[in-house]
Structures are given as C-alpha cells and as structure tokens.
C-alpha cells in the first residue's frame, strides 16, 4: 500500500473483496493512520488498545460496541470512537461492513491474542 494514492477507492468494492470475517484490509494511508475495511459477523474479542483510539464507521448493517458499562449501537452511517485504553468488544448479529481508522501502531485485537488476530502484514495484503 503506497502512502500516495494514485486513484480513488470504492469502499463498497473493497469490502466486497474481503473474504474472511474480522480480517480488516488497508485501503488507504493518511500520515500515521490506516483506513481499513472489514466484513464482520458475530463477535471479535474483548480487548483494548493502550495507546491508540479506534474509529468505527458502519458502511452497511448494524454493529454493537460492547463496553464494560454498557453498549453503543451503530447503524449505517454511524461513527464511534473507542478511546485508548477502553476495553471493548465489537459484535454484529448479522453481517456488517465497517470502515476503521486507526494509527499504524494499532494491533488488531490490542492486548488480546486470539485465532482471529491479524497482523499488520496480513491487513496490508492486496485485495
């Protein structure tokens, strides 16, 4: 992924090419930030990112961000930022397409390593 985009990116097309659930793929870079798309269904894992905020934007469907003291329900077009250090668990009761914006240093599942954890190298694979 080049830091200088030479063409526009269709988020709809990009997310349709993602084969695995909970496997974000980088579609753009802005300074020290990756813009990613993902297909999600079910739940990921309770985790936190000690030093990074994480932005979720729902492109299609519904997403619930479970927090230790409640949950945030997101519909298409809704955005929510999970502040650094806050434990959270993304959940989609049916397939949902999301856009994530996070610093390049952000680990996929933060402080939790699971079979769903994807490395940055995996997220950078071409679609």
Q: For the regions a protein language model found, what residue spans apply to each?
A:
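A short, N-terminal "cap"/entry segment at the start of jelly-roll beta-barrel domains
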Residues: 1-36, 113-127
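Residues that act as N-cap/strand-start positions at coil-to-secondary-structure junctions
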Residues: 21-22, 49, 82-84
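Short histidine-centered beta-strand/loop micro-motifs
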Residues: 26-27, 38, 45-50, 66-67, ...
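A cytosolic small-molecule/anion-sensing beta-strand core signal
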Residues: 31, 59-60, 75-76, 94
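Structural motif
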Residues: 34, 43, 62-64, 71, ...
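Short, conserved beta-strand element in jelly-roll/cupin
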Residues: 39-40, 49-67, 101
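Short acidic-glycine-tyrosine-enriched beta hairpin
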Residues: 68-85
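Ligand-binding loop in jelly-roll beta-barrel domains
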Residues: 84-114
């Amino acid at each position: 992924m080049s830091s200088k985009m030479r063409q526009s990116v269709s988020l709809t097309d990009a997310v349709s090419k993602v084969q695995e659930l909970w496997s974000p793929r980088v579609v753009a870079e802005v300074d020290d930030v990756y813009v990613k798309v993902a297909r999600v269904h079910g739940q990921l894992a309770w985790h936190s990112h000690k030093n990074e905020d994480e932005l979720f934007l729902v492109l299609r469907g519904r997403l619930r961000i479970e927090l230790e003291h409640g949950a945030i329900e997101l519909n298409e077009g809704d955005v929510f930022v999970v502040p650094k250090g806050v434990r959270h668990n993304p959940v989609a009761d049916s397939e949902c397409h999301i856009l994530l914006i996070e610093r390049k240093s952000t680990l996929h599942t933060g402080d939790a390593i699971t079979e769903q954890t994807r490395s940055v190298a995996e997220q950078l694979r071409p679609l």
